[in-house]
Amino acid sequence: MRNITAAVGIALLASGVVWAQTPERPVRLVLQITVDQLRGDLIERYSAGYGEGGFRRLLDEGAFYVDAHHRHANTETVVGHATLATGTDPAVHGMVANVWLDRVTGKLVYNVEDADYPLLGEGGGVDASTEIDPTQKLATTQGRSPRAIRTSTIGDEIALSIGPKAKIFGVSVKDRGAITLAGHAGTAYWFSKTGGRMVTSTFYRDAYPDWVNAWNAKGVPASYADKSWELLARPDAYLFGGADDQAWEVDFPGYGRTF
């Protein structure tokens, strides 16, 4: 994937989490943020341009691991997300690619598609005529679930530890980003480009909660229509800023080579 997308992974609102060393106060929130294509070394590489908060705060006040690696070569979206969410390799958690060949049917399968769990509500599926992600177009059903994930995730383990008090959510622009991080015990919500709203499948919910309906009713995505993402400074002020627009780059429909 050439575009950088952010998956706000797991928001776990819980009490009584047991760690190796019990903190003075119980941990009530665990937030996992997974950024597509953001290698660990890039955090320091671009650190000179950081402002207050954000990555600067994480570097100054957090623990930064400079030599942490996972043993897989295929760096597609679902592979990395599932590896970070489970702590296991693709050969174990099963998410080996965005699309793989099903040995039983002999057909290509999209990683989180599941005909048994259709999308909740109408008009939220993938529109193949406008979808720019070729892997999404290969799905033979609009249904989605974490069934293909063979191991438990961080959220699953915390749910097992805490029980019904744990509130586990995965939120992402992409279905595969939200589902892998929400796991089997959480609830995944992702953005429907067709419907312009956050959606889920019947694996997770029988009806949308009021707070999701309220957010969708605000029409936040529509407020960004006909607007562009403008740089704060001149292009030459950025590292590699002058090389951003090249003739050999992919020209995404509706986006161009830069946006």
Q: Which residues make up each language-model segment?
A:
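Short, structured active-site-proximal loop/turn typified by the sulfatase FGly-forming signature C/S-X-P-X-R
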Residues: 43-92, 167-169
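His/Asp/Glu-rich, glycine-adjacent segments
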Residues: 88-259
